[in-house]
Amino acid sequence: MKLLYTDIRTSLTEILTREAEELVAAGKRVFYIAPNSLSFEKERAVLECLSQQASFSITVTRFAQMARYLVLNDLPAKTTLDDIGLGLAFYKCLAELDPKDLRVYGAIKQDPQLIQQLIELYHEMTKSQMSFLDLENLTDEDKRADLLLIFEKVTAYLNQGQLAQGSQLSHLIEAIENDKVSSDFNQITLVIDGFTRFSAEEERVVDLLHGKGVEIVIGAYASKKAYTSPFSEGNLYQASVKFLHHLASKYQTPAQDCSQTHEKMDSFDKASRLLESSYDFSELALDVDEKDRENLQIWSCLTQKEELELVARSIRQKLHENSDLSYKHFRILLGDVASYQLSLKTIFDQYQIPFYLGRSEAMAHHPLTQFVESILALKRYRFRQEDLINLLRTDLYTDLSQSDIDAFEQYIRYLGINGLPAFQQIFTKSHHGKFNLERLNVLRLRILAPLETLFASRKQKAENLLQKWSVFLKEGAVTKQLQDLTTTLEAVEQERQAEVWKAFCHVLEQFATVFAGSQVSLEDFLALLHSGMSLSQYRTIPATVDTVLVQSYDLIAPLTADFVYAIGLTQDNLPKISQNTSLLTDEERQNLNQATEEGVQLLIASSENLKKNRYTMLSLVNSARKQLFLSAPSLFNESESKESAYLQELIHFGFRRREKRMNHKGLSKEDMGSYHSLLSSLVAYHQQGEMSDTEQDLTFVKVLSRVIGKKLDLQGLENPAIPTSPSSKTLAKDTLQALYPAKQEFYLSTSGLTEFYRNEYSYFLRYVLGLQEELRLRPDARSHGNFLHRIFERALQLPNEDSFDQRLEQAIQETSQEREFEAIYQESLEAQFTKEVLLDVARTTGHILRHNPAIETIKEEANFGGKDQAFIQLDNGRSVFVRGKVDRIDRLKANGAIGVVDYKSSLTQFQFPHFFNGLNSQLPTYLAALKREGKQNFFGAMYLEMAEPVQSLMAVKSLAGAVVEASKSMKYQGLFLEKESSYLGEFYNKNKANQLTDEEFQLLLDYNAYLYKKAAEKILAGRFAINPYTENGRSIAPYVQQHQAITGFEANYHLGQARFLKKLDLADGKRLVGEKLKQAWFEKIREELNR
């Protein structure tokens, strides 16, 4: 055993490589062992340090891979599972357990997160040389019972299936202990580099090999001062020093100091010594000069995007200044990889800098995983419509075009069908010939055929199920779709998709291994496949060696690259505080470590945090050979952040913080990096003058659209794709002639009028362009209203010989049997329940009709208007016609006065403010239309709410009181003529505010005609402004702004062009109610009509 240490500015790899070459010269075979995260990088570093640049006798590898290079004899032929296979095994065993058998984990026993944690615990216990039976020492009885039961079941299953347990390293340990290694240990040497601690498993391997006579050389970074200090707690080198002291004590071998004498202390050595003295409380006087500040720079940036742009510019500039440099001389370290990943690609592509981020990507969100998830959902939830749509949207199932998929989705949404039997029936329903049923049935068969074959599979052997799955992938054109999708991609993306496919196939291979010979149902297979894919990860390798490597800062080693940029070094990211997210708490780990024998040790992350983070900071400061840039943004993930305390310490030593900003106000030689980056800088430069006054704008895109829009306006140009504010064009004369020929009647409905005054452009979309809502065959508010209307229409038309209740029940029975309503309300249990609710509403509403002797109904569903009688005459002589349908016309028995009733599904009242602004013209329009047809004597126009009254029992003292209060809400709401009100009974809400004199009645009709005239003139002129109304002057109601995606209107930007409702001019603090409010609005109407 030979232990070495060196100062951090001397390359430990060079020293250990020389040791390795000397051992090779002595006839030894050398295994150069590096940590998992550094093994590939270390291989290149060792090759660069070798005098011959290569050696067949030196193998750079990891502890786990050593077994590959040693000859192991008489080992049982067991198949080794990786994490995917192990996850499948856990999933299977947990699925077989009854949730009641697990006291803690029963409810989440098949949750992917739990399975992932169980896998991690499995590996952790293997690495720590701990047996699962050691879990008996847990104090939590429920958790102990659950974990023991799970691991016992998984272990039994692995043994039964001849599947290897434990890691590759544990198999090597077992082979050495049982003398199953035939390799000559005297010819083997281990050189170990880059470790500051061994796991229990790694230490066991070193111990066994040392006992077999294998020569071992272990090196680490440490200063002589730290190594010889009697107190190392809190020292920067604490991790490596404790590691060396432990090994020296165990193997009775003092560590040798291999530090080199440097002619001059460089900037990074100076910073290291200052940091070390700060942490060991010793005094050290070193001056930091301008050269040091140039070599080790601390940047303070505003945002993460700005950081990346500054780094990209700096790299480009250095490459421009020195032709000997290449991309491989640069390294980028990230404080938080996930936060920078997307911006990194965008900005580095813009600056044309090739980079490689060596990070595994999860398959959980890949379309292939969503494809499997959708098929599982189809099987598990018995062919839900949404699951089939999700399957088609992956673009992996069948070779149908996007237009075919859209047409199929639209039709099945129209039908509202669920369940395989419903999809197996031939499509026959069409809405007035809107759908191409022949084509849709062809699509239905193409989509269903592969799924039907697959879903017909019964529980069978895993091998047979995999064959059927393979056939399904071919028949469903999944492999073909993947190939077609990748052919149009760039080479890098094609490689990425190839890795995804490999990962997918690997999950299937592991499934075949774990379930070989077992009977598996299709649903279990799909669930296992989805679980395996959710756990899977894939990664690509760089296409060329000459790239900028990007990695997390905590994986860095000293002297890694010439130029290193470490960004995102905020207080939250540096240092990284490891959190324990496993199934065992730190306290439980401590108890297990105390209860087990020596050498068996679970890692307690919190106890390692301080020494690990200090050593990481030391490695970070020494990661560069020439220049190091440490940066922290003021805004990190859109939240304010502070720079790391370690950076503040360096500033305290004399290094300077540099405020770095992207300057778009001028161009400099630093912008001459690449064509794309220069173009971007020019665009930003020309925008700067416009953008300087718009700091409140939320997004760059909105700012950009305004800037370009203004530029175009100045030059008399127009780009409809990026308007400065949403606007519409007046329709051309020939278009208007085609829409509204002079000889053809122009019709305007009351609903069209309301839509026009809500938002003129909404009227254009719905009534001119004919924009429709998506069709639905299932019952909706419209069908509910028609159903109730039909019941009352029929009930009131039946002869009076029978009681009203009998007539109502007969009407309910006959209406329910009509083909239209029978098809809708018998389709599903949900529809049947809806029908029962509607019938309750009908019976409740019938109460008003049953007990109202003062009136008689003379007409139901009465049509009004038409070409015979113009509603209004425009100034140009053109007539405007109004036609519609009144739900019911009543007549007072006393004097024959006419009243109009409109059924509503919710409480609706006539409101003068809304009427004045064109938003409540329904009742006046009905009265005006009937008056033009010759009716002269009216008692009113009103709404009847068709709903069950709801009464809070807390607000009344008794049930009788609740009945009284409920009856109050069941009244006709609307407008009534004052002279007829005495004839109306208790069912009419005839307070003074709702009663009109003859003069007020005529004024109401005249103003209503005025509203129609204004709207008709604008419509016939082809002018439709984008002007949704605002009631409070601050926002737009959602039902008013239904077409935002089309118009682009945003209330927070374009409120100025909204239509502000006209209101009464009241003195401050004055509030009118009742009849005074009515009189005030009539006064305003007179002003508007100049009367």
Curated annotation (Swiss-Prot):
* Alphabetical keyword list: ATP-binding, DNA damage, DNA repair, DNA-binding, Exonuclease, Helicase, Hydrolase, Nuclease, Nucleotide-binding
- What EC numbers are recorded for this enzyme? 3.1.-.-
Known InterPro entries for this protein? ADDB_N, DNA_helicase_suRexB, P-loop_NTPase, PDDEXK_AddAB-type, Restrct_endonuc-II-like
One example of a Gene Ontology biological process annotation: double-strand break repair via homologous recombination
Pfam families documented for this protein? ADDB_N, PDDEXK_1
The cross-references to SUPFAM superfamilies, in alphabetical order and at most eight, read:
P-loop containing nucleoside triphosphate hydrolases, Restriction endonuclease-like
Gene3D superfamilies linked to this entry: P-loop containing nucleotide triphosphate hydrolases (3.40.50.300)
Cofactor names: Mg(2+)
Tell me the domain of life.
Bacteria
Molecular function, one GO term: hydrolase activity, acting on acid anhydrides
Quote the record's miscellaneous comment. Despite having helicase-like domains, this subunit does not have helicase activity.
The annotated subunit structure for this chain is: Heterodimer of AddA and RexB.
Q: Which PANTHER family match?
A: RECBCD ENZYME SUBUNIT RECC (PTHR30591:SF1)
User: In which family does this protein belong, per the annotation?
Assistant: Belongs to the helicase family. AddB/RexB type 2 subfamily.
Q: What does this protein do?
A: The heterodimer acts as both an ATP-dependent DNA helicase and an ATP-dependent, dual-direction single-stranded exonuclease. Recognizes the chi site generating a DNA molecule suitable for the initiation of homologous recombination. This subunit has 5' -> 3' nuclease activity but not helicase activity.
The protein's name in its UniProt record: ATP-dependent helicase/deoxyribonuclease subunit B
Instruction: Tell me the organism.
Output: Streptococcus pneumoniae (strain ATCC 700669 / Spain 23F-1)
